[in-house]
Every structure is written in structure tokens, then in C-alpha cells.
């Protein structure tokens, strides 16, 4: 018989070229800022822009907060890595100290669905226009994130490195806030022990639920896409099948799943088979 090719179902989406005017407006906002902060989302992975994002952060001396799904975009022992932003209170003090919020590939679905609490100016760098309205931006540059970040790196001056101490202080405050007393093995200590024992290239999966907020702050990730979690819709029962899939895709890497009783029982049949 004959073989017939089917049409490609994946759309061929090309990023628009960033406008020179948009780039100049973005650069002007960065030049005017003394304390910029980078809020980095999953779009950074889609455009393979992790390296250029870190390069810009180092050039500006700006602290970096990533969303849960974007852990590993900046290695988590980097001095400018502050932690994860969830849209809650834990990161509010750090973000409020900045005088310019630069969102990079940020999908507001990863944040809590409530009003944006910061009066600070926002510069959005995105691959497509932000239509959700949850994060109101003063300026937005649209295009390939890797290209935009590389261009901005060359046209803005070096920053004052305020982010090194700011990120360090934030990490210390998060550690203190999560280090609650326990008579036995606490969840946070279990995560810390796992991170100490397991190799640096371990892939971690994490279920939805309150425990996820702890894991995303305590577990350290050292490469893009080495931390997999169900965020946005936040469906439970993800961690175990996610870990099995990760192991099949990367049999040479160790994999760990962080889950609770509900998430485990929803997927326990996957372990049986």
C-alpha cells in the first residue's frame, strides 16, 4: 500500500521582531531603575532564554524570582536567585523593595487569581501580548525572549548589584519562615534531606496542594525542566505518573516524586502496574 503524509497539526508560529521603539522604551525603564527585579515564567523555557535571562540579571545585579514551573531557569545556588514567586505574601517584601518589576515570559495563570498588589512600574517581556489583565504593565516588548534579552543586555548600563544582598536576605527569611518546630520528621526537613542525598541532576516532580508551596521553596533545582509540577489548574495526582514519565524519558537520571496522601492514592494504580 501507499504511505500518505498527514498535515502538520502543530502551528508554525513565528515570533514577531521586537520593535526598535519598544526596545528603546524598555531600555529607558531599566536605565531609570536603581533596584530592578526579574520575575521569570515558563515562557523563558519555550524560547530557550534561560542563559540570556541570567546574563541580564548578572549585568543588572537584579534578584530573580521564578514561578514554580520555571524553577531551574537560574541555578538555585546562584547568588542572584531569590526563590519562587507564587503571588502570595511570602515574596511581597522583596518585590516591594524594587523600583522596577521586569516580567519575563510570565504567565499569570501560575499566580494566585487575585489583584496585583504592587504599585511599582512593570516592564513585560513576552512572546505574545498579555491579555489576562492580572499583571498591568507600563510597557511591553513582544518577540523572541532570547533575542530581546540579548539586545537589552547590550544597550543598558551595568546595575548597582543590589540584588545579591536582597536575594540572600530573602532566602534566609524563607528558610526561617518554613523551619517550623517539629517533634518528628517534618516535611521541610524531608525535602532538605532528599536534596542533600540525591545527585545534583535529580528530576523532581511535585503534586498540587499546600505542600507544594513548601517544596517549591525548599527543593533546589539546577537545570531547566528538572522540576515538574502541576501549576495553574493545579490538578492532584500528577507527581507519581509525572515521575514515571520522567524516568522513561531520562533513564540515566534519578527521579523523586513529592506527593501527599491524596495525590498518591489518586495514582497508586500506576505504581501497581
Can you say where each PLM-predicted feature lies in the sequence?
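Conformationally flexible catalytic loops at phosphate/diphosphate-handling active centers
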Residues: 1-32
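Generic structural signal for well-ordered, non-membrane alpha-helical segments
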Residues: 16-19, 23, 42, 46-53, ...
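Glycine-rich, anion-gripping cofactor-binding loops and their flanking helix/strand elements
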Residues: 42-127, 223-253, 267-269
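Short alpha-helices
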Residues: 126-130, 134-158
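Active-site diphosphate/adenylate-binding microenvironment
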Residues: 168-252
Amino acid at each position: 500500500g501507499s504511505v500518505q503524509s498527514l498535515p502538520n497539526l502543530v502551528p508554525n508560529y513565528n515570533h514577531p521582531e521586537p520593535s526598535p521603539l519598544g526596545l528603546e522604551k524598555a531600555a529607558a525603564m531599566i536605565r531609570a531603575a536603581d533596584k530592578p527585579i526579574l520575575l521569570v515564567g515558563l515562557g523563558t523555557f519555550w524560547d530557550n532564554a534561560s542563559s540570556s535571562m541570567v546574563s541580564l540579571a548578572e549585568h543588572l545585579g537584579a534578584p530573580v524570582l521564578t514561578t514554580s514551573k520555571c524553577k531551574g531557569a537560574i541555578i538555585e545556588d546562584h547568588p542572584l536567585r531569590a526563590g519562587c514567586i507564587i503571588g502570595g505574601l511570602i515574596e511581597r517584601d522583596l518585590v516591594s523593595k524594587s523600583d522596577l518589576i521586569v516580567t519575563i515570559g510570565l504567565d499569570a495563570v501560575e499566580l494566585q487569581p487575585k489583584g496585583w498588589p504592587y504599585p511599582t512600574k512593570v516592564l513585560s517581556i513576552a512572546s505574545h501580548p498579555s491579555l489576562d489583565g492580572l499583571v498591568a504593565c507600563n510597557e511591553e516588548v513582544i518577540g523572541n525572549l532570547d533575542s530581546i534579552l540579548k539586545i537589552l543586555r547590550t544597550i543598558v548600563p551595568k546595575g548597582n548589584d543590589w540584588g545579591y544582598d536582597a536575594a540572600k536576605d530573602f532566602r534566609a527569611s524563607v528558610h526561617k519562615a518554613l523551619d517550623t518546630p517539629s517533634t518528628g520528621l517534618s516535611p521541610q526537613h524531608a525535602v532538605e534531606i532528599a536534596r542533600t542525598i540525591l545527585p545534583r541532576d535529580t528530576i523532581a516532580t511535585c503534586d498540587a496542594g499546600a505542600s507544594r508551596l513548601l517544596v517549591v521553596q525548599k527543593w533546589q533545582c539546577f537545570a531547566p525542566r528538572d522540576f515538574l509540577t502541576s501549576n495553574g489548574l493545579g490538578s492532584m495526582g500528577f507527581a507519581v505518573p509525572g515521575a514515571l514519565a520522567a524516568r522513561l524519558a531520562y533513564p540515566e537520571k534519578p527521579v523523586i516524586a513529592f506527593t501527599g496522601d491524596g495525590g498518591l492514592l489518586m495514582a497508586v494504580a500506576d505504581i501497581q502496574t
